[in-house]
Amino acid sequence: GLKYSIKTIAEKQFNEIFLYDGIAVLNSADFDEKQLEDKISSIAQVDKSMLMQSTDGIAENESENQSVSMIVPKAPENMGDYIDLVSAENGSNLEVKSGSVIITQKLAKLLDLKTGDTITIKLSGHEEKEFKIGGVSKNYALHYIYITPDDFESVYGEKPVYNLSFIDLKKDTDENSFK
């Protein structure tokens, strides 16, 4: 029943969409960006990592609003190493590119949006902003919006503050022993 369907959704999300081995959640007040990258890369079991900013907000239309997380990858060109952004519309690979955002499938359905439409987002601590949708990606849990660092800075007038890192471990690492 319900337990099985929740387990199935989580397995699909973490086997098909999220490709990373782990996430380090960072208290950005403790480190600057360079220190964070150095600290993570100094961990012997880490093969590669990428800093991200995750900010909570609300996406809305005239009749509906949904909680979202806006993800700003430091290196959007490497996003595919950590999250498989596949078009829900045609199965092609999506890239986080300047001038538009990628939103996830269920969010698009709930707000009746598609590629080329405009989405309204209110992030915590910011005013409502509108974004052109450059793609709708497959996703099984929660709602995400992906945007480039340059577009984030252009729209919000501030540089991203990277507060998490996606991590891939070396092949011979026991994931259960990594802390």
What are these regions (language model features)?
Residues 1-20:
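Alpha-helical transmembrane segments
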Residues 12-16, 34-48, 52-118, 130-132, ...:
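Short beta-strand boundary microenvironments
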Residues 17-18, 95, 136-176:
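Small-residue transmembrane helix packing/gating motifs
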Residues 20-31, 55-57, 168-170:
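Conserved short loop/turn motifs at secondary-structure junctions
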Residues 31-37, 172-179:
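Short, conserved charged micro-motifs
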